[in-house]
A protein has these predicted regions:
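Acidic ATP/Mg2+-coordinating residue in the GHKL
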Residues: 75
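Short conserved segment of the HATPase_c
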Residues: 80-92, 152
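Short helix-loop "hinge" at the ATP-lid/N-box region of the Bergerat-fold HATPase_c
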Residues: 45-49
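Glycine-rich ATP-lid/hinge loop adjacent to the conserved G-boxes
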Residues: 50-51, 93-103
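Conserved micro-motifs of the catalytic ATP-binding
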Residues: 22, 26-29
């Protein structure tokens, strides 16, 4: 994937395994912004790697049902404090981890959330401090087509 290539040097330098599975799903979205969002999430995974663990990984996978496709990015980094989780998408919020790692601006996940909102998708995050962080981007199916069909039925377009 383009995201793995873009982050190749950082992944190698930090000895992080990058795995992609079941990611052959087709979603209708803006490819440039999608790549930007994934880069933000992967950069966070790299930045917040748990240096005490012998093996570090970032796993990207997708799952599909009738209503949506969910892209999941999972890492086994340092995790996020439960008290910080509700605010990770807030502008300029860096939380405890951001204070410990001076590279944090608090803008990455904020921008990811704003882009998801604009593109009609949803982003969510779950984490356990010291264990993992899981980011999910949900792409809803047929919203665009449903809108057009509804408009056609009412005689307007």
């Amino acid at each position: 994937s383009a995201v793995a290539l873009k982050n190749k040097d950082d992944l190698l330098e930090n000895n992080i395994t990058f795995e992609v599975s079941n990611a052959d799903k087709l979603v209708l979205t803006d490819a440039k912004w999608m790549e930007f969002m994934l880069n933000q999430i992967v950069n966070n995974s790299i930045k917040y790697k748990d240096k005490t663990k012998t093996e570090s990984y970032i796993k990207m996978s997708a799952a599909e049902d009738k209503k949506c496709i969910v892209l999941e990015i999972l890492d086994n980094g340092i995790g996020i404090n439960a008290s910080d989780l509700p605010r990770v998408f807030d502008k300029s919020f860096t939380g405890e981890n951001g204070h410990e790692y001076s590279k944090a601006t608090g803008m990455g996940l904020y921008i990811v959330k704003k882009l998801c909102d604009k593109l009609g998708s949803k982003v969510s995050i779950e984490s356990v401090k010291g264990e993992y962080t899981r980011v999910k981007i949900t792409f809803y199916k047929n919203d665009f087509y449903k809108e057009i069909t509804d408009s056609n039925e009412s005689g307007s377009m």
